[in-house]
Amino acid sequence: MLRFVSSQTCRYSSRGLLKTSLLKNASTVKIVGRGLATTGTDNFLSTSNATYIDEMYQAWQKDPSSVHVSWDAYFKNMSNPKIPATKAFQAPPSISNFPQGTEAAPLGTAMTGSVDENVSIHLKVQLLCRAYQVRGHLKAHIDPLGISFGSNKNNPVPPELTLDYYGFSKHDLDKEINLGPGILPRFARDGKSKMSLKEIVDHLEKLYCSSYGVQYTHIPSKQKCDWLRERIEIPEPYQYTVDQKRQILDRLTWATSFESFLSTKFPNDKRFGLEGLESVVPGIKTLVDRSVELGVEDIVLGMAHRGRLNVLSNVVRKPNESIFSEFKGSSARDDIEGSGDVKYHLGMNYQRPTTSGKYVNLSLVANPSHLESQDPVVLGRTRALLHAKNDLKEKTKALGVLLHGDAAFAGQGVVYETMGFLTLPEYSTGGTIHVITNNQIGFTTDPRFARSTPYPSDLAKAIDAPIFHVNANDVEAVTFIFNLAAEWRHKFHTDAIIDVVGWRKHGHNETDQPSFTQPLMYKKIAKQKSVIDVYTEKLISEGTFSKKDIDEHKKWVWNLFEDAFEKAKDYVPSQREWLTAAWEGFKSPKELATEILPHEPTNVPESTLKELGKVLSSWPEGFEVHKNLKRILKNRGKSIETGEGIDWATGEALAFGTLVLDGQNVRVSGEDVERGTFSQRHAVLHDQQSEAIYTPLSTLNNEKADFTIANSSLSEYGVMGFEYGYSLTSPDYLVMWEAQFGDFANTAQVIIDQFIAGGEQKWKQRSGLVLSLPHGYDGQGPEHSSGRLERFLQLANEDPRYFPSEEKLQRQHQDCNFQVVYPTTPANLFHILRRQQHRQFRKPLALFFSKQLLRHPLARSSLSEFTEGGFQWIIEDIEHGKSIGTKEETKRLVLLSGQVYTALHKRRESLGDKTTAFLKIEQLHPFPFAQLRDSLNSYPNLEEIVWCQEEPLNMGSWAYTEPRLHTTLKETDKYKDFKVRYCGRNPSGAVAAGSKSLHLAEEDAFLKDVFQQS
């Protein structure tokens, strides 16, 4: 970024930015960059060079003599209106001694005469230093195997990092160079202002090409780049005391011994060990310690299977006897609820002390084998913790840490979706630490077949994150990098990437044979020393510890593992161990399976609703609302005041508002949710003159809760996962994710299948997340018609074969894995949303809603429906005794769910049919067995029962409802042998017809079938 416009240099405002003027003439100007003299915009105008130029310019402003004479002339020329930008930069004559094929800039009027050899050398050394800053990581010794990274036959040393490139020879190595801007300025201390060329190169090699390499020059912020240089471009970036080395050794010993112990005791079990990357454990523990020192109170970790058990044991502090009991199989007891999961998927929540004496809450979220799917869940949990701690401004008290595999980080799209939350106002977590456990292989696939970039971490350049590559065999370098990443995140509240390059001792799991596919790689691995052996030899050789001391410590650690192994056979795991988040005062899943909890009321006093109506229909004085929206808002207020004609959006707003007044936080998220895809919600008002915003519900006076509504990025997988994670943190959050159209929710199918449907049964992970899914066949084609109701119902855990006992009926909601509803009235929507929060447990809710019913006259409620009663599982026909006969006169009963009711109502009205009644099933799962049985018994003279749906036969509710309907009929007084007749669209591969005319023809056909029209 070029920032040359200032009060001191106002001339740049009239001439345009320096970068702009140079770009215009780039085709004709030959420019000397920081390495290669080129024609055009190759080097001089790149982002990284711009930062360098900015640095030179600021130094020149303070003291023109502090920069090279060529820079002094250049900046003077740019300040001179008589000299065109194309002539501003003039290279000294002797700079032309560049490698063949390059060309120096032509001389102009700005500089005349000769420049001595020292000037040329100084400028070339500046270019050399910059080349190390930009490309030094390509030469760094970050690969312990020497096969993928660093300089080797496949990756030759970049020419810009060689002395020959600048025309230097061995005779130049002893020449003294002035230190200053562009040449190791932080080494100019203690009276030392010069250094030989050899010393400079040696320092550059140590700083940028040792066991770690840093990519940061892609970051446009000079402040951030300078901050990093202050920490890595210094004589000794890190030096550890004896006590610090003892701590590193101890942590590495525990990590290494853990894998060795499991390998000895359970040689044939899968554990997805961390061998070859054990230094990650002391790295993470350093990250935890430093972050806590800087104010972090909660750390949420997400990772896949590789090394998970080691992290659980050594970082989160899960008892080793608990882990060993899982290997033995002794934890599969009758008193442990849920189906459980394999040991390398389980999560944990634990509070433990750190080296500073402060405590930290560590949470490792449970995860499936769908790699990276836990990433957005972790960030959602972290954001919710920041909210709970009233820290959404500073974002210092909670931290998300994600561990990725190298293949998954580069290959899984949800990684990018998750990183995209970084600066979004309602999704930012103040920066995430990403740790790539890079074993240079993905199952059996080499990196060259798994990604199109040199590093797996290159994706992170999109968010201007620094990328630290570090050799896993150098545990001190690893520890330094993790510490640096913690400080970066605290300072700048942005992401940092740590790419720990190591190897994988075994195959994908311990029973796999990797030499089938990577024979040469595994020959190298067979010769590798373990990380702890490398570090032990270093400590012994430098005299820090004796071999005897180290061996005794290893033995002590091993004996502690043996003790835990003995205790494992009698170990009884506590319920709290598995919980990702502990909800104090809430019933556990085990208690829900045995107790019957009362149904709490969801109705609200009329006075409260009318006060809310005033809030919803007003705005600040001087705020200019769109003229069309004024009418809509006033009608909302009027409907509440008169108590009649309350529409869908108003019913929803009343639910949100009353929950906030009850002390429940409400968060609504998704694409375009502020206005609503169908222009129905208008939760956020925009001033038509200033574009200032006003959110009526956020003005409600309750210190305990607030209302948040946020348009999300155009992502389903990432955002749904984020909101799921948000919902895990506290039961006092109503979190609702809304799809733009229900059809697009399946982009997040992994979150639905692996987390929402099975999270509680597998991991005791409780959530009250609401999925709001627009659904309904309106002739808009196969991409805008269906939220895939059938898929949610297929995931339902209820047994359709048996009518529930009385006890089971009372506990239906407690036993279900999630709920599926398709309400048709604003009042029922109001009660279902309030019911989510007004009970002593939480269950996810798939809430299907009709686009057509948002404004339909048949979808209106009166205020009394909000002040009395509650959610209705089924709604009987309100036309009995009006436009149709009584229940006794009814011959045909049509069961249905959702907006097909409006088409049926219209057809019945046109036919003048008096003997057909409709019964709307508002809640599909748990199924209303008892309510439906009682309703059927109230119709004494039915001749047929029909199920009608607008979806095709192989979609919608039919496959789910058919067995349950027949189970229910067997419990009725008169209809035990009845068969329900299906009326709906024929089976189809596509969701819906693409043309309106075909849509209407299909609808007409099944409506005729319902009423037996010829």
Swiss-Prot record:
Miscellaneous field: Present with 14300 molecules/cell in log phase SD medium.
SUPFAM superfamilies: Thiamin diphosphate-binding fold (THDP-binding) (SSF52518)
Catalytic activity as recorded in UniProt: N(6)-[(R)-lipoyl]-L-lysyl-[protein] + 2-oxoglutarate + H(+) = N(6)-[(R)-S(8)-succinyldihydrolipoyl]-L-lysyl-[protein] + CO2
Cofactor requirements of the protein: thiamine diphosphate; Mg(2+)
Molecular function (Gene Ontology), one example: oxoglutarate dehydrogenase (succinyl-transferring) activity
Pfam family, one: Transket_pyr
GO cellular component: mitochondrial nucleoid; mitochondrion; oxoglutarate dehydrogenase complex
Lineage: Eukaryota, Fungi, Dikarya, Ascomycota, Saccharomycotina
Transit peptide segment: 1-30
Record text on subunit structure and interactions: Component of the 2-oxoglutarate dehydrogenase complex (OGDC), also called alpha-ketoglutarate dehydrogenase (KGDH) complex. The copmplex is composed of the catalytic subunits OGDH (2-oxoglutarate dehydrogenase KGD1; also called E1 subunit), DLST (dihydrolipoamide succinyltransferase KGD2; also called E2 subunit) and DLD (dihydrolipoamide dehydrogenase LPD1; also called E3 subunit), and the assembly factor KGD4.
Domain of life, per lineage: Eukaryota
The protein's role, per its UniProt record: The 2-oxoglutarate dehydrogenase complex catalyzes the overall conversion of 2-oxoglutarate to succinyl-CoA and CO(2). It contains multiple copies of three enzymatic components: 2-oxoglutarate dehydrogenase (E1), dihydrolipoamide succinyltransferase (E2) and lipoamide dehydrogenase (E3).
Primary location: mitochondrion
EC number per UniProt: 1.2.4.2
Record entry for activity regulation: Catabolite repressed.
Binding locations of thiamine diphosphate: 306, 406, 439, 441
Alphabetical UniProt keywords: Magnesium, Metal-binding, Mitochondrion, Mitochondrion nucleoid, Oxidoreductase, Thiamine pyrophosphate, Transit peptide, Tricarboxylic acid cycle
Family annotation (NCBIfam families): 2oxo_dh_E1, PRK09404.1, PRK12270.1
Positions contributing to Mg(2+) binding: 406, 439, 441
Family the UniProt entry places it in: Belongs to the alpha-ketoglutarate dehydrogenase family.
Organism: Saccharomyces cerevisiae (strain ATCC 204508 / S288c) (Baker's yeast)
Annotated protein name in UniProt: 2-oxoglutarate dehydrogenase, mitochondrial
Locations listed in the record: Mitochondrion; Mitochondrion matrix; Mitochondrion matrix, Mitochondrion nucleoid
An individual GO BP term: cellular respiration
